[in-house]
């Protein structure tokens, strides 16, 4: 049995979002193929997720802890942010497989997804500094990145390259990409392009 972590990084539903629709299509196929696997879904836009962002409170809390302060001496807000940040790091570390689904907005990933990426790019946990340079501490995981783009980029856009680079940096060597592309540029081909992407999502669900 494997553990799959799903990171949903779009505030809309599958009826309104192509990336979420592809994610749901993938999950339906994956559940059918892997009925005993554990699946955790992290919706970075859900209020209950309480996604921490690196801000003054978090930075000052880390500084105090590095200086030897006890966790209990931090403010209540600082304790909550540090604890939640650590929980998300541990959640990623416990997963065997990771699926990330997001739109490309303004040539980049959504800000909430960037905040989540910060929680998995942690010195001493997912990578370490050595005399030879940074070394990954994460191994044995694989990832699937689902992204919707209005035009055709074929994985050469900054957003998908950023996700792949971070995952590679911390040791996730296998990062596959599923892109829902071109629908805004070619609305007359919308049905064809969307159906092609959903077919690929179904296939990934069977093989991932």
UniProtKB/Swiss-Prot annotation:
Query: Pfam families, alphabetically?
Result: Flavodoxin_2
Q: What does this protein do?
A: Quinone reductase that provides resistance to thiol-specific stress caused by electrophilic quinones.
Q: Which reaction does it catalyse?
A: 2 a quinone + NADH + H(+) = 2 a 1,4-benzosemiquinone + NAD(+); N,N-dimethyl-1,4-phenylenediamine + anthranilate + 2 NAD(+) = 2-(4-dimethylaminophenyl)diazenylbenzoate + 2 NADH + 2 H(+)
User: What GO molecular functions are on record for this protein?
Assistant: electron transfer activity; FMN binding; oxidoreductase activity, acting on NAD(P)H as acceptor; oxidoreductase activity, acting on NAD(P)H, quinone or similar compound as acceptor
For this chain, the family text in UniProt reads:
Belongs to the azoreductase type 1 family.
Which coenzyme or cofactor does it need?
A: FMN
Q: Where does FMN bind?
A: 10, 17-19, 104-107, 148-153, 184
Can you name this protein?
Answer: FMN-dependent NADH:quinone oxidoreductase
Keyword Nucleotide-binding present in the record's keywords: the answer is no
Which organism's genome codes for this protein? Enterococcus faecalis (strain ATCC 700802 / V583)
Q: Which UniProt keywords apply?
A: Flavoprotein, FMN, NAD, Oxidoreductase
What the record notes about the co-factor is: Binds 1 FMN per subunit.
Quaternary context: Homodimer.
What is the uppermost EC class here? oxidoreductase
Say which domain of life the source belongs to. Answer: Bacteria
Name the EC number(s): 1.6.5.-, 1.7.1.17
